[in-house]
Amino acid sequence: MASTAKGVVVEFDFAVLNGAQLLFDVAQRYLQALDKIGLDMPTEEKYLAGRSYEEGLARYFKVVKTKKTAQKAARELAAAFAAAVSEVVTKSVAPSFRNFVTTIAAKGVKVVIATRAAPEPAAEAFAPLLIENVSLYREVSPFYGCPRWDSWRRACMANDVARANAIAVAGSGCGVKSALLAGMASMAVMKARVAHQDYTGASLVVNDLSAASAKKLLSYLQV
């Protein structure tokens, strides 16, 4: 029988962490080391953001005329970003985010914290938050800058959350778009680094995740 449980899926790496800036820094270093390939923000937005790593890199590699293989580079760049997230995640769970999670969970709404961090640092970072109605979901998305639409769906399925009764908490415009493609409503956390992206379609827009934004989300879910 299909789940009817209400839930919230938080893409921690972009909605809480400043993942967009971290990813840009990682990509810039990686491409420079790979073949002295430059990367600036307009180029990142034009060729990489909101696409699979492989598709975006293949498009950009044609422009810069490198002989490097996009498929291999995509795997390496995704792994490098996951490693960078793993390094900072244990220091990134602020009291305001704890309040966001516990406020929602206290109302019986499931909270799924999604991250690409490695198992050990993820467990260390989130263990104090894994109370009743809160779970951790790990997946390295093949998309640059946001989860792919089916990542949202898998996070719901793995944690017995009904997509029709769930809201995705995204940290970018492309995250909002992928949530829509997954058939989910979304709350967008507006980050200065990607504020230029299109947030059309977000059901809610907030500046951070806190007890106050949790109450807005609960009101939207009619809890």
Model segments located where?
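Conserved SAM-binding loop
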Residues: 16, 46, 111, 168-169
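Structured helix-beta-strand junction loops
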Residues: 51, 107-108, 201
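Anion (oxyanion) recognition and catalysis
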Residues: 32, 105, 180
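Short, acidic loop-to-helix structural element flanking the phosphoryl-transfer center
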Residues: 83-113, 149
